[in-house]
Regions:
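Enzymes that bind and transform nitrogen-containing heteroaromatic metabolites
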Residues: 4-223
Length: 223
């Protein structure tokens, strides 16, 4: 069974430490989410099994994650290549508290690099020794600035519907990467609710066809 060396690609990101400095111009802020064809990223109970199913059973290429809580995905070759390119580009992650809680803090170290969590209250037991998870309570602009600085010229990946919406509304997103899963949920948590200043105009997409998933990458045209 073929294996992609995903864990080797993320080791450099795991060694990255938070360093607040002038942000390199090359840093991009990229929304990254799996979504059903009808626009939901989770069901009404926060379940994500259907939209993440392509990670686990869409092919025979093994993709190993890094971080403190490693996983092994089984995807098609096009999806493995897509993940390789994406992870190679990322230097930090920005999420909301809901995503942090669902992921149980990624074991203290996110596979894609330092993680910045938007929250009103730091959870009990955090921050932890040797963890690269940082908490931000002074707004989306500050969170993006800190994540860009930690990314050291690489891109910042944004997870979570609410955090992505905040970035869009603040004009901070450069690209939207959507993995369209081959499923209709009918109800649940929508990715693109509560948008201000619509329409948000996107550029022409790059499309990669996997098995059970279509990977779309749109540039966001700045207002």
């Amino acid at each position: 069974m073929p294996v992609r060396p995903f864990d080797q690609m993320v080791k450099a990101n795991e060694r990255t430490t938070m360093k607040i400095s002038n942000q390199p111009a090359a840093s991009k802020v990229i929304a990254i989410m799996s979504m059903s064809l009808d626009g939901y990223v989770a069901d009404l109970n926060d379940g994500v099994a259907e939209v993440f199913d392509w990670y686990m059973s869409s092919g025979d290429v093994e993709v190993h994650t890094g971080g403190s809580d490693p996983m092994t995905f089984h995807v098609s070759q096009p999806s493995a290549d897509h993940l390789h390119d994406l992870v190679s580009e990322l230097g930090a992650v920005l999420t909301g508290r809901r995503t942090f809680d669902k992921a149980e803090g990624w074991g203290g170290n996110h596979a894609w690099g330092p993680a910045f969590v938007l929250t009103h209250h730091i959870p009990d037991g955090w921050p932890r020794p040797n963890s690269t998870v940082h908490f931000v309570s002074d707004g989306i602009e500050s969170a993006v600035d800190q994540a860009k600085a930690a990314a050291a010229g690489k891109s910042v990946g944004v997870h979570g519907a609410d955090t992505i919406q905040q970035c869009l509304n603040a004009g901070l997103l450069d690209e939207i990467h959507i993995d369209i899963a081959a499923v209709l949920l009918g109800s649940g948590i929508r990715l693109f609710d509560h948008l201000a200043g619509t329409p948000v105009v996107l550029g022409n997409p790059t499309t990669i066809q996997g098995i059970g998933v279509t990977h779309l990458r749109y540039p966001v045209r700045k207002r």
